[in-house]
């Protein structure tokens, strides 16, 4: 069962209405879910068969959904009110920025983008808008290289390969694409190599790469001291640093999750972005614009941070400074967060 809450002015919660929601609501989607990613006002997911579905704002083509025969198809392509199948192909990764999406094919080598990218984030050269999924070229991949993770910020994205190579495009003016590309680029570029890289996340003006050793390398991040705080913490806590197993990024805050289930956060904290629980049983953290949602070993869900649209489940719209437990009708096994949206996938009869 899929649940959603938060900002919904463009049908991005998949509830067949455009009203903001302050508590988890059941989404009319009956397939098992593997992955969820959220953009400014759109949402993508991969189902159990690795097929792509989307809902929300599609005016710039960011959902990848095209009406090829509008005279015979009454569905408006501008807004997808419920999750709609976009492609019958198989995909493995997906990520969304403000008004664009990037999806990785099941072969982990082919990449498609769609939507609008005024800062080059589509990776389609001078083409800044694509109404449907369009394959983009990553010319540097060798025969044995494949993508193992991908993430998008507001106007940039980065993928990392099994060889530790980083590729990406979009806005790199604040160092978020790394020191090699300190500019805006509209074609996928080689950004550098990080030994044993296994995951990447993107904020607005920074990106971060997690190595197998638990060490985290921050690209950009001067504003809000994301890089400085993270680097200092790692230098002073080498044993804890080696236990980091997952990372997550808000627009201006970086969170790290350890194998012991603890969360450490660096950067901006004006909207309770660091107000994480003291609990030590966290197994997943998902970061939205400026709020976070945590999943515990026991299948419960905690949430905190910015709450203007009810995305942190306070109906008074006040930010949540003490992580609160959501009341759910089942055991949570996936959490996701977007641009003022929150998502939980639950199993009702978990044993």
From Swiss-Prot:
GO terms for biological process: tRNA wobble uridine modification. Keywords: Cytoplasm, Nucleus, Repeat. RCC1 repeats lie at residues 1-48, 50-106, 108-162, 163-212. The keyword S-adenosyl-L-methionine does not apply. It comes from the Eukaryota. It is found in: Cytoplasm; Nucleus. This is RCC1 repeat-containing protein C10F6.04. It comes from Schizosaccharomyces pombe (strain 972 / ATCC 24843) (Fission yeast).
